[in-house]
């Protein structure tokens, strides 16, 4: 399992975990991980901050789910929403484009409950590393 956003991930095993996937989206959706509309719009309108959003998302969504079942169900999938990710020079996610994204809350929740690290999908991971190629 990995996470990403619709703009950069175009593979076949993407799963939308947002309320509004792209209009042309024909891939899978996983509504159980979508933020409640009221919570989504409160954050979008700056009525709540990131900390309050995370608390409520955990209370209203994640607390009702079994992390083991979620992981087993979505194993091998890429969880998709809209926010772009920002990486440090080592390839670690610093935050999303506006500093916040619920897919990273899900990643953290899976780590806290199962010890599983769910990384942000990196297109460079898909490049085959052929060690037999000559350098010259």
Provide a role label for each language-model segment.
Residues 1-136:
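Residues lining hydrophobic/aromatic ligand-binding pockets adjacent to catalytic sites
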């Amino acid at each position: 399992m990995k996470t990403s956003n619709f703009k950069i991930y175009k593979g076949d095993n993407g799963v939308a975990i947002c309320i509004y996937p792209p209009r042309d989206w024909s891939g899978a959706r996983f509504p159980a991980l979508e933020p409640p509309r009221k919570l989504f719009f409160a954050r979008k309108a700056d009525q709540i901050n990131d900390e309050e959003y995370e608390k409520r998302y955990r209370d209203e969504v994640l607390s009702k789910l079994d992390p083991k079942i979620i992981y087993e169900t979505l194993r091998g999938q890429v969880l998709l929403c809209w926010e772009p990710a920002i990486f440090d020079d080592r390839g670690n996610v610093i935050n999303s484009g506006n500093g916040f994204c619920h897919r990273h809350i899900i990643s953290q929740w899976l780590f806290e409950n199962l010890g599983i690290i769910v990384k942000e999908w990196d297109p460079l991971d898909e490049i085959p590393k052929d060690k037999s190629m000559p350098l010259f």
